[in-house]
């Protein structure tokens, strides 16, 4: 019976009757009395018997019994049994289905290189299933095992593969700006310089780009995207040649190059082929077309096409859900919320952020819920809950800052400043505006610079600094027009038109505002166009009285 206990503890979780019989035969010769022996172990309360669909399975009642039995075997004998279990017992389909089981037995058998292959398979398999913590554990197990190898070029090549694999689930679970991701990105960047022709080089460069973009090194992220693109062209890598458009488009959007960004992102959407590109989730940690549609939504809103913007992010969410990739779903929910936030649709913001928070309570969603919390706070404010909404919005912004997130922050901080101005908390608003400007100068994220200039104009006007106010309103219009950001230009024109009316020029303000409002073909029921039409009516009335 002791031999059967030992055999069983080697099998571990792989405990159906057939496997136990085969291993028992391997361990101590043919075992015609296996049924009797196992039965005696069950009667002795050492094993627990369970009936499955096709056969019975067995497990130890107490881990201590298993451990004692395992340690009672000679180390070399244990090693041989682990190896023979992989070679002779576990069927091939099971090896593909549960690679971590094979990896464990090969590790215990001392077959490091073979084990690494299966730990890597297990990591990627878990990552594809959005089991991020499990994937992290598998990749880290492999990295621990790699340390047993001699320090040479092959070891560095193997480590690069595992570090690159680890990056995706780390980003999905902790966000691009976490210390863990920062460390892995630094290590993979270092290794990639020493490993020639590494197949992981593109996922390494992509992760570095994502870190730079999210943490607020926008121009550096653009250079990283260009480096990725150039390498893809030199190597003729079709997958990377496709993925580059998502990267270039996102960086250009943040730089305020909206039309160039639109063209890049349009390529990422139109060139997508499911059979070729859906599998890129494994290398890049997100569905590329989903991400492209998300950023396209932001670009289109800025350019003055709010209905098209909402259509793009809605399609992104539908695609992410059809794929079933958690991180892609989280991203799409955030961008659905963001476009609704920019459109000032409080109900939609609340619905999308609540769905995101519910998903985040079950699975990690990186930094998306942190940013979502700030938008959730604004939705409460828009519905009249000042006491609950304002602290929640501040909390979301502060949490994002503490996490090292800079991208998207101008949308949130300028909205907060606008609210504070409306509450006559001028000093608080001035502080937020100054912080927003400093952040924008540091990161290079310029796609909402026009809104910042508009708010500086509103602040100066409130403070009685009329020349400065007019200069800021004009600067806002100049930036918005240069970027072709019609949504921002509309908001700046509303403010400037009101300012002109207050300074005795309502007809001039009315003409400017009527011109920009007439340009829009989408979003007629949106907050900003409704506000513009009301302002035009008021300005016409004032002009008649002059």
Model feature map: region roles:
Residues 1-137, 141-149, 420:
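Short secondary-structure boundary elements
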Residues 109, 129, 173-175, 195, ...:
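Structural motif corresponding to the intra-repeat A-B loop/turn of tetratricopeptide repeats
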Residues 43, 163, 188-190, 229, ...:
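Helix-coil-helix junctions within alpha-helical repeat/solenoid scaffolds
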Residues 79, 112, 129-132, 178, ...:
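TPR-repeat structural position
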Residues 140-339:
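Internal alpha-solenoid helical repeat scaffolds
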Residues 79, 83, 96-103, 116, ...:
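Start-of-helix signal in alpha-solenoid helical-repeat scaffolds, especially tetratricopeptide repeats
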Residues 110, 123, 150, 167-175, ...:
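Short coil/turn linking the two alpha-helices of tandem helical-hairpin repeats
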């Amino acid at each position: 019976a002791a031999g059967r206990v030992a055999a069983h503890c080697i099998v571990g979780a792989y405990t159906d009757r057939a496997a136990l019989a085969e291993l028992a035969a391997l361990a101590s010769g043919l075992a015609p009395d296996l049924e009797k022996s196992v039965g005696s172990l069950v009667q002795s309360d050492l094993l627990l018997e369970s009936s499955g669909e096709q056969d019975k399975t067995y497990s130890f009642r107490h881990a201590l019994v298993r451990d004692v039995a395992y340690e009672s075997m000679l180390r070399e004998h244990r090693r041989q049994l682990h190896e023979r279990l992989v070679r002779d017992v576990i069927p091939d389909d099971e090896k593909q289905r549960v690679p971590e089981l094979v990896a464990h037995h090969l590790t215990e058998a001392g077959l490091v290189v073979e084990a690494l292959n299966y730990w890597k398979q297990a990591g990627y398999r878990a990552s594809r299933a959005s089991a991020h913590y499990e994937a992290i554990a598998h990749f880290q197990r492999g990295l621990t095992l790699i340390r047993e190898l001699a320090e040479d070029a092959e070891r560095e090549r193997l480590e690069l593969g595992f570090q690159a694999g680890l990056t995706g689930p780390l980003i999905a679970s902790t966000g691009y700006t976490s210390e863990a991701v920062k460390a892995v990105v630094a290590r993979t960047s270092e290794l990639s310089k020493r490993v020639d022709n590494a197949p992981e080089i593109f996922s390494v460069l992509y992760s570095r780009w994502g870190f730079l973009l999210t943490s607020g090194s926008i121009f550096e992220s653009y250079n990283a995207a260009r480096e990725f693109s150039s390498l893809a062209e030199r190597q003729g890598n079709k997958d990377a040649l496709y993925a580059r458009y998502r990267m270039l488009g996102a960086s250009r959007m943040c730089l305020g190059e909206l039309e160039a960004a639109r063209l890049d992102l349009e390529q990422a959407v139109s060139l997508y082929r499911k059979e070729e590109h859906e599998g890129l989730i494994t290398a890049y940690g997100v569905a590329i077309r989903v991400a492209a549609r998300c950023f396209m939504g932001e670009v289109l809103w800025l350019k003055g096409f709010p209905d098209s913007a909402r259509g793009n992010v809605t399609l992104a969410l539908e695609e992410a859900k059809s794929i079933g990739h958690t991180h892609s779903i989280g991203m799409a929910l955030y961008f659905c919320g963001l476009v609704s936030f920019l459109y000032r649709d409080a109900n939609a913001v609340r619905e999308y952020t609540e769905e995101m928070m519910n998903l985040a309570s079950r699975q990690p969603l990186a930094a998306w819920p942190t940013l979502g919390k700030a938008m959730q706070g604004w939705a409460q404010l828009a519905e009249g809950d000042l006491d609950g909404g304002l602290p929640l919005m501040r909390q979301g912004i502060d949490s994002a800052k503490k996490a090292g997130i800079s991208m998207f922050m101008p949308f949130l901080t300028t909205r907060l400043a606008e609210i504070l101005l409306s509450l006559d908390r001028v000093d608080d608003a001035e502080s937020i505006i100054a912080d927003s400007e400093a952040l924008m100068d540091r990161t290079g994220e310029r796609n909402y610079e026009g809104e910042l200039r508009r708010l500086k104009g509103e602040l100066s006007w409130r403070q009685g600094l009329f020349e400065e106010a007019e200069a800021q309103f004009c600067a806002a219009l100049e930036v918005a027009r240069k970027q072709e950001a019609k949504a921002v230009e509309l908001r700046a024109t509303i403010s400037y038109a009101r300012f002109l009316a207050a300074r005795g020029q309502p007809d001039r303000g009315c003409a400017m505002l009527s011109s920009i409002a007439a340009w829009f073909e989408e979003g007629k029921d949106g907050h900003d166009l409704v506000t513009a039409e009301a302002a035009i009516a008021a300005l016409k009335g004032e002009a008649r009285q002059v």
